[in-house]
């Protein structure tokens, strides 16, 4: 049966319908706004795989080329591997729904969001977030929703829900908020150095904006009338649990307080191995259960110690930042480099400057665009003492890189004043929590080391949460284990003035305004501390670019001279680049950027362009080259491609019988421009230039 609900959100009508498409899926909806349509399906297997001990949730998001009236490029002419934007949207859909499945539901579950129509004003990613929740709500899959997502902007001081793409260009805040009826579940986005108080207002403005979407999903689920599957609670072997506790609890209590990550993990591994050996005969085949009980003990012990005693795994209190060491300029040939170390997390971050040729071309549903600021985050397995087979960057690396990129993009100079392409690469060398925020700190320092005139230094910090009943503790600069055992990972980046990026994920049902307010305030204090540590090494951008970075010189020519610079089939511009080795970029306005690490080569290229575009001026002297001799005079080239006529009467003060008596082809001759007619023909005189010389 086809069922449909409609709701207003941010002045836009959003429609959710089910029962028309993909009816064999466990749940399927089409979410639409304007001309944008997204089909979202949810399917879960009937039973879990034998021995399954984690929840296998997969989320896929794909933008069909036909949705924008396009045919895919490439040889095969079909959609291929996901773009970075599609990967990031997968993460946006995944993160808010993942905490809302029952703990003992371990069936393979797949969410597929397919963009089947797209306009340029309604974000299909936001509709997909709503659709994922709605598809689960109308299915028999157990799900503790609904949730909904909304994009929040602030334009001219006014918060706006789901602004269009053009509107967002005027906004100083761009965040995505996902929430349930009573609590925030996920936040992600960027801002132009906005205060923590304003960010909090934006988040809860978004929470208020989605209430109608939540109610609409409940109504849709009631109309669909599909009963949820029953999820039985896990059967606990109490005898085994008691035995494991007897053998390991006191030792685990000591182990979780070992400050070194490697030593702590090794000790826990040793305890695990000894318990497995001791119980192997009595409880044969129970290794997985035993490891589960030990993990539960570790979880409870760490959290209890933090809540009751205010002391964390490594001995810090809740607000202390780990020791920070920094260094810049450590790679001699790189344009800018920084080594940022915070505790057992270390990032080598390198900044490289390029030209417009190095810009990333992005082909999307809405046309082609160019990207001139890039940040690539790499997380090699050795950073955590592991081995793995590495291919392309995974979803996590792409997501962490984009978070760091957003944090730094707000302080990068505008292209008009700094016409460079900038690429930041962050290689994580060690990791024990907060590696993406180490990338932000190192990226800021590497740009300053490269001489890029950033608006202000940026630092980032990861905040955690331990919540037991009504008691909670906010943790500054969390460890990897605190992320794993805690309830929240809240990353905040910004300058001393305000926030430039944030990202929050939780593992519980949601967080309140009070918790978020405390976390943002504590993050601000931590960020200022980190910025002060960074400033001890470098606090402002170097006055000069690296000697190995290209220098870009900008000149302007008249628009009708652009073709003269390019030449037939690109002959002229190709000749300049081959002769000088420079890189040249010309736009339609006549703006020309010339890039080279060699100043002399750049100067030569400028002269060649000036010669190609120069115009003769009456009364001015020129050193010309005789190109052709005729009976009535000689044609003399005064600029490349620009000739003028020296009439026989203008060759000398005396009467000249034959032109060849004075000039021959290939001669260099000093001439003076004595006129330009209406057709642009240039009249030259050798006679007027006799006795004169070119100014130096």
Curated annotation (Swiss-Prot):
One GO cellular component, as annotated: cytosol
MF annotations from Gene Ontology: 3'-5'-RNA exonuclease activity; magnesium ion binding; polyribonucleotide nucleotidyltransferase activity; RNA binding
Keywords: Cytoplasm, Magnesium, Metal-binding, Nucleotidyltransferase, RNA-binding, Transferase
Disulfide bonds: none
Cofactor names: Mg(2+)
One Gene Ontology term from the biological process aspect of the record: mRNA catabolic process
E.C. number(s) listed in UniProt: 2.7.7.8
Record: residues binding Mg(2+): 483, 489
Compartmental location: Cytoplasm
Highest taxon of the lineage: Bacteria
Domain KH: 550-609
Reaction(s) the record says it catalyses: RNA(n+1) + phosphate = RNA(n) + a ribonucleoside 5'-diphosphate
SMART domains, A to Z: KH, S1
Matching InterPro entries: ExoRNase_PH_dom1, ExoRNase_PH_dom2, ExoRNase_PH_dom2_sf, KH_dom, KH_dom_type_1, KH_dom_type_1_sf, NA-bd_OB-fold, PNPase
Domain S1 motif: from-to ranges: 619-687
Record's function text: Involved in mRNA degradation. Catalyzes the phosphorolysis of single-stranded polyribonucleotides processively in the 3'- to 5'-direction.
Family to which the UniProt record says this protein belongs: Belongs to the polyribonucleotide nucleotidyltransferase family.
Listed name of the protein: Polyribonucleotide nucleotidyltransferase
Species this chain originates from: Geotalea daltonii (strain DSM 22248 / JCM 15807 / FRC-32) (Geobacter daltonii)
Gene assigned in the entry: pnp
């Amino acid at each position: 049966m086809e069922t449909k609900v409609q709701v207003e959100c941010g002045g836009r009508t959003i429609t959710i319908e089910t029962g028309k498409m993909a009816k064999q899926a466990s749940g399927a909806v089409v979410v639409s706004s304007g001309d944008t349509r997204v089909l979202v399906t949810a399917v879960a297997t009937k039973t879990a795989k034998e021995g399954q001990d984690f929840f296998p949730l997969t989320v896929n998001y794909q933008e069909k080329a036909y949705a924008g009236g396009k045919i895919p490029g490439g040889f095969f002419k079909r959609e291929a591997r996901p773009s970075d934007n599609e990967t990031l949207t997968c993460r946006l859909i995944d993160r808010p729904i993942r905490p809302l499945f029952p703990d003992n539901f371990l069936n393979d579950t797949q969410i597929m969001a397919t963009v089947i129509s797209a306009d340029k004003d309604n974000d299909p990613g936001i509709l997909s977030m709503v659709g994922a929740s709605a598809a689960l709500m109308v299915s028999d899959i157990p799900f503790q929703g609904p949730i909904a997502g909304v994009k929040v902007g602030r334009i001219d001081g006014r918060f706006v829900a789901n602004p269009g793409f053009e509107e967002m260009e005027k906004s100083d805040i761009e965040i995505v908020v996902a929430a349930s009826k009573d609590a925030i579940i996920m936040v992600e986005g960027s801002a132009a150095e906005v205060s923590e108080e304003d960010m909090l207002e934006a988040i809860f403005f978004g929470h208020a904006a989605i209430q109608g979407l939540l109610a609409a999903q409940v109504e849709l689920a009631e109309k669909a009338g599909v009963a949820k599957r029953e999820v039985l609670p896990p059967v606990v072997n109490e005898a085994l649990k008691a035995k494991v506790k007897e053998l390991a609890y006191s030792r685990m209590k000591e182990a979780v307080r070992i400050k070194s990550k490697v030593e702590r993990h090794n000790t826990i591994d040793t305890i695990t191995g000894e318990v497995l050996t001791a119980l192997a005969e009595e409880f044969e085949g129970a290794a997985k259960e035993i490891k589960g009980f030990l993990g539960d003990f570790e979880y409870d012990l760490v959290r209890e110690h933090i809540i009751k005693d205010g002391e964390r795994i490594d001995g810090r209190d809740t607000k202390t930042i780990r020791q920070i060491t920094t260094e810049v300029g450590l790679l001699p040939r790189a344009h800018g480099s920084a080594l940022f170390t915070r505790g057992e997390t270390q990032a080598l971050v390198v900044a490289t400057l390029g030209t417009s040729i190095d810009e990333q071309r992005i082909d999307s549903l809405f046309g082609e665009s160019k990207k001139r600021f890039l940040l690539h985050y790499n997380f090699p397995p050795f950073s955590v003492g592991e081995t793995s087979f590495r291919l392309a960057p995974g979803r996590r690396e792409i997501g962490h890189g984009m978070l760091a990129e957003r944090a730094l993009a707000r302080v990068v100079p505008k292209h008009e004043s700094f016409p460079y392409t900038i690429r930041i690469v962050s290689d994580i060398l060690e990791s024990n929590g907060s590696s993406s925020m180490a990338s932000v700190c190192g990226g800021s320092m590497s740009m300053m080391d490269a001489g890029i005139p950033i608006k202000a230094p940026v630092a980032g910090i990861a905040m955690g949460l331990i919540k037991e009943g009504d008691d909670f503790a906010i943790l500054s600069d969390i460890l990897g284990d605190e992320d794993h055992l805690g309830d929240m990972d809240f990353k905040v980046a910004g300058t001393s003035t305000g926030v430039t990026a944030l990202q929050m994920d939780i593992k519980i049902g949601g967080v309140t305004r009070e918790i978020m307010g405390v976390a943002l305030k504590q993050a601000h204090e931590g960020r200022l501390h980190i910025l002060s540590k960074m400033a001890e090494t470098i606090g402002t951008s170097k006055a000069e670019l690296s000697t190995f970075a290209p220098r870009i010189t900008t000149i302007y020519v008249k628009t009708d001279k652009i073709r003269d610079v390019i030449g037939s089939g690109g002959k002229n511009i190709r000749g300049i680049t081959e002769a000088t080795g420079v890189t040249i970029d010309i736009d339609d306005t006549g703006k020309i950027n010339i890039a080279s690490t060699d100043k002399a080569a750049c100067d030569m290229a400028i002269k060649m362009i000036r010669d190609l575009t120069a115009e003769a001026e009456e009364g001015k002297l020129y050193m010309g080259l005789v190109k052709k001799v005729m009976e009535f005079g000689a044609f003399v080239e005064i600029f490349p491609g620009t000739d003028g006529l020296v009439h026989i009467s203008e060759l000398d003060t005396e009467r000249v019988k034959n032109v060849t008596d004075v000039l021959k082809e290939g001669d260099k001759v000093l001439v003076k421009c004595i006129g330009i007619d209406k057709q642009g023909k240039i009249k030259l005189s050798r006679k007027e230039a006799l006795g004169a010389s070119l100014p130096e």
